[in-house]
Design a protein with these regions (language model features):
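Bacterial Sec-dependent N-terminal signal peptides
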Residues: 1-24
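Beta-rich carbohydrate-recognition and catalytic domains
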Residues: 24-269, 273-321, 327-381, 396, ...
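Glycine-rich, charged/polar anion/phosphate-binding loops
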Residues: 385-387
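Anionic-ligand-binding alpha/beta catalytic cores of soluble enzymes and soluble regulatory domains
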Residues: 390
């Protein structure tokens, strides 16, 4: 066989192999050094990606004309498919998409990657089947349709609708790729799944935070705009802002992000309007220092650090996370007190993560606790109560609180795969 015929045969074999490994409208190119590029046109709503939970994470960059649109870590199936997850293509319809994929560093050569089952099971589709397949899905408590969920975030009430955002991984039922998932309800029992609201960017993934209804347009984003302030978790943890003018369905990130910078591990912003000072207050935690930090602002964009609380108070065993601050009436006295909520992991009364609280006075700058430092008050003594925070703008002056019904001791080990 001459060289020309051999070359032609090799090209034919490569073509047949490529067709066997993907839909004909998806091109898979194996480039060596654990690098694979997948090319397709976004002419359907989703790219369905096969996931194997025990597989190492592959780093995926979504490119259009060479520009990175989104980045995520995905456990692409190697030996078997556990389930499918959707990459939402609706914002990129008609565009030529390139997925630049780097598989795990310990893969020895490109032939390992070529044999992975994910390539032949990727598919473009206009539908994603999210009907429940789990025997143990709660009927009463909120769960995501698919993927991972932990802390409730950014919750607000407006126009008869309760909006719940939450820490969400759209690409597996394990922790990672932190995004704000979104559900809505008119009764806090029956939930409608909405599209994910805020994805990660160059500053990092989207950790916990809060939202407020800016009724008086203090931010300049419009009267009644929804303003979300959250932690950008990249190489460091900084605080960022996004706003919505369609009642929280979509958000635009503020061009001046980050709005608060720190050299500490600071996160989980909670913003409230303080009627006594006519200012916004923001509380967040310096997680490893066991401190709650207090800030004030007139416009939600520019913040002044006012004070701190926490050294030596309450449970100090684990990291502090997800604070909240609210003023409540003291029953039968006509008096009001401030309640500062701080979640802790580990260090709960029955192990793992839990929610503690402090009662005292707050003047917009400093919190003074009524109890002695060694006194710890627990909101719940059970094991399934963490990241408890309240809705903003609740009707009738209520303070409505929701917690994550799980525990970091076993959250990754519950007997489900479609969601956790």
């Amino acid at each position: 066989m001459n060289l020309k015929k051999l070359s032609t045969l090799a090209m034919l074999i490569m073509f047949v192999l490529g067709a066997a490994f993907a839909q004909s409208n998806i091109s898979v190119n194996y480039l060596g050094n654990n690098n694979t590029m997948v090319k397709f046109k976004a002419n359907q709503k989703y790219l369905l990606m096969p996931i194997e939970e025990s597989a190492p994470e592959a780093q995926i960059s979504v490119l259009i004309n060479g520009e990175i649109m989104q980045q995520m870590n995905v456990r692409l199936a190697q030996g078997k498919k556990d389930y499918l997850v959707p990459l939402d293509l609706k914002a990129w319809q008609g565009k030529d998409i390139v997925l630049n994929i780097r598989t795990a560093n310990d893969r020895s050569n490109v032939r390992d990657s070529r044999a992975d089952v994910c390539w032949k099971q990727m598919e473009l589709s206009n539908t994603f089947d999210a009907k429940n397949v789990e025997k143990f899905r709660p009927a009463y408590h909120h769960t995501p349709l698919y993927g991972w969920m932990n802390d409730p975030n950014g919750m607000f009430y407006k126009d008869g609708v309760w909006h719940l955002y939450y820490q969400f991984n759209p690409y597996a039922s394990v922790w990672g790729n932190m995004t704000w998932g979104h559900s809505s309800s008119t009764d806090l029992i029956h939930w409608k799944a909405e599209a994910p609201a805020i994805y990660g960017d160059g500053l990092g993934t989207i950790f916990s935070g809060s939202s407020v209804v800016d009724k008086d347009n203090t931010s300049g984003f419009g009267s009644g705009a929804i303003v979300a302030i959250y932690t950008s978790a990249g190489m460091t943890q900084q605080q960022s802002m996004a706003y919505s003018t369609d009642n929280g369905l979509t958000f635009t990130k503020y061009s001046g992000n980050p709005i608060i910078m720190s050299d500490q591990e600071c996160r989980d912003d909670k913003v409230i309007w303080n009627e006594q000072t006519n200012k916004w207050n923001l509380v967040m935690v310096a997680a490893l220092e066991h401190q709650v930090l207090f800030y004030s602002s007139d416009d939600l964009k520019h913040w002044t650090k006012e004070g701190a609380f926490g050294h030596g108070y309450g449970a100090q065993d684990g990291v502090w996370e997800c604070p909240d601050l609210m003023q409540l009436p003291v029953r039968g006295t006509g008096e009001k007190k401030w309640v500062l909520i701080v979640n802790i992991n580990p260090g709960g009364p029955n192990g793992g993560s839990a929610t503690q609280y402090f009662v005292g006075d707050f003047d917009g700058k400093q919190f003074v606790c009524d109890s002695k430092p060694e006194c710890t008050k627990w909101m719940d003594y059970g094991k399934d109560h963490y990241a408890a925070v309240s809705w903003s703008n609740s009707p009738n002056g209520r303070h409505t609180v929701m917690a994550w019904m799980s525990n970091w001791q076993y959250a990754n080990a519950v007997p489900t795969k479609q969601f956790r």
